[in-house]
Amino acid sequence: MTNIWKSHPLMKIINNAFIDLPAPSNISSWWNFGSLLGICLILQILTGLFLAMHYTSDTTTAFSSVTHICRDVNYGWIIRYMHANGASMFFICLFMHVGRGLYYGSYLFLETWNIGIILLFATMATAFMGYVLPWGQMSFWGATVITNLLSAIPYIGTNLVEWIWGGFSVDKATLTRFFAFHFIFPFIIAALAMVHLLFLHETGSNNPTGILSDSDKIPFHPYYTIKDILGILLMILVLMLLVLFMPDLLGDPDNYIPANPLNTPPHIKPEWYFLFAYAILRSIPNKLGGVLALVLSILILALMPMLHMSKQRSMMFRPISQCLFWILVADLLTLTWIGGQPVEHPYIIIGQLASIMYFILILVMMPVASTIENNLLKW
């Protein structure tokens, strides 16, 4: 009798992707984040579905419906906080996943990398729209500030913003459409993630050395299934510590004040995972320039394959590049800190220096370091 896993059309796909998949024997825990992101996405879709059953997307009742979920719905509070903090876990895993790709040269899988960038943009858009839904002060003003950035686009900007708003300000129409988009986007993300995986399985996984590992492959199951389960358990542990002990640690207290168009909060800032980009945006005193820098801060990832000057794929054996990589990480942490600070001295200048440093590191210093390393190795 033939094995159903290998003969059935659907089972065959699952088998080739998660069971009999040939995987490098030496991939480290940095390769766990793909599966963690998958779990995050499933968790977000499930908790989001249950929240959507009780949420109302009308400006008069949105805030109250979230309160109702937390107070009156059975286990509504845990579903709400798992969804809110699940987004933070999602972005932690995303940043680690992208960082791994940069460090080990995974960006040389062009299709996989480019779909990953689209996934990153889609996830950021989804998180932004989700933050608007509770209709607190930061929801309303965050939506106003970020959507208003599109007015910097020459000629069509103002019309574009009013079209997105569905009026002359962020109002009922905006909230309703954001809810609709926030609901549909995760399914688009799931579909894109499957394409991401499809392209990855065309080439096989990279590994820490960056050397071709075709001669030394092991089956995905049981080796990496058990490794992924360990990663998932650790992630759920961290998530539940957040949810059960400090659910509001990463949130903004201003979002517990219902949205009021007549009262601006003293410091408008997005969720922590957007602060690095927000700091870059604020560093440029010109609206259009800021918006361009904001988009380029993520889109610069698409240039990584072209900026790869090294004869080696991974940074594992490239100490100069390693130093620059960790300086880049420190720079991004600095930008994240600055994004949450008020616009005043000395934060302005620190933010500007960190923003310049970010682009110089990626566009100039890393390619130069790669070339130096090639020469040191007489290549």
Curated annotation (Swiss-Prot):
Q: Which InterPro entries match?
A: Cyt_b/b6_C, Cyt_b/b6_C_sf, Cyt_b/b6_N, Cytb/b6-like_sf, Cytochrome_b, Cytochrome_b_C_euk/bac, Cytochrome_b_N_euk/bac, Di-haem_cyt_TM
- Could you tell me which CDD domains the record lists for this protein? cytochrome_b_C, Cytochrome_b_N
> How many cofactor units bind, and how?
Binds 2 heme b groups non-covalently.
Q: Which residues bind a ubiquinone?
A: H201
* A GO cellular component entry from the record: mitochondrial inner membrane
Q: Which residues cross the membrane?
A: 33-53, 77-98, 113-133, 178-198, 226-246, 288-308, 320-340, 347-367
* Annotated positions binding heme b b566: H97, H196
Q: Name one GO biological process term.
A: mitochondrial electron transport, ubiquinol to cytochrome c
The entry's other comment says: Heme 1 (or BL or b562) is low-potential and absorbs at about 562 nm, and heme 2 (or BH or b566) is high-potential and absorbs at about 566 nm.
The record's subunit annotation is:
The cytochrome bc1 complex contains 11 subunits: 3 respiratory subunits (MT-CYB, CYC1 and UQCRFS1), 2 core proteins (UQCRC1 and UQCRC2) and 6 low-molecular weight proteins (UQCRH/QCR6, UQCRB/QCR7, UQCRQ/QCR8, UQCR10/QCR9, UQCR11/QCR10 and a cleavage product of UQCRFS1). This cytochrome bc1 complex then forms a dimer.
List the protein's name: Cytochrome b
Q: Which organism is it from?
A: Aepyceros melampus
Lineage, uppermost ranks:
Eukaryota, Metazoa, Chordata, Craniata, Vertebrata
- UniProt lists the gene as MT-CYB
